[in-house]
Amino acid sequence: MEFSFPLPGNPIFDYVLLPCFIFLSRVTDVSIGTIRVILLTREKKGIAASLGFLEVLLWVVVITQVIKNLNNVFCYLAYAGGFATGTFIGMILEEKLAIGFSLLRIISPQNGSEIADKLSEAGYRVTIMNGHGSRGPVKIVFTVLKRKKIDQAMKIVQNVEPDVFYSIENARRTNTTTFEDSPGLLRRGILEKILKIRK
């Protein structure tokens, strides 16, 4: 028994294999494109350029197959479906990768100092300042952190004040990477006291 790959003109190739190839290729190139655009906003130019090359290469291969099969409606559906699916998957991948840094801003009328202390103890570098809201004085707490650590930081904040007001913004560029994964201010103070006692 001989086995051969279906050639163009074969119904299995035209209506099953080719649309599946177009769909999967389109999912891949659109997912890459979504991540590439986000990387550009994060100043990751080298990686974005490399992904752009791969994205366009896949697109050329796919569009060539679509043009060769203009009478095949399944190719159109696969192309459009792959675009929609690729956009969705690209956004999920970007969230999972959590590339770059974010600015976390917390506004609290009563617990700002405690929130700042807890974040500092956990190793986040924190800036706190006084402000005035529509209902009176508030404390404004700022910290720049890796996006993948936002959930961890928010758990600390909400343990102190569950209904605290906060906002998260994209920190497009920072001038240092040492503001994270370093001892917090309170922890550092404790270490300094221990060293002084030993001396």
Swiss-Prot record:
InterPro entries, A to Z: DUF2179, DUF5698, N-reg_PII/ATP_PRibTrfase_C, UPF0316
What is stated as this protein's family in its record?
Answer: Belongs to the UPF0316 family.
Q: Which organism is it from?
A: Leptospira interrogans serogroup Icterohaemorrhagiae serovar Lai (strain 56601)
User: What is the official name of this protein in its record?
Assistant: UPF0316 protein LA_0606
Q: Name one GO cellular component term.
A: plasma membrane
Q: Write down the HAMAP family for this protein, in alphabetical order.
A: UPF0316 (MF_01515)
Paired cysteines (S-S) = none
**Bilayer topology:** Multi-pass membrane protein
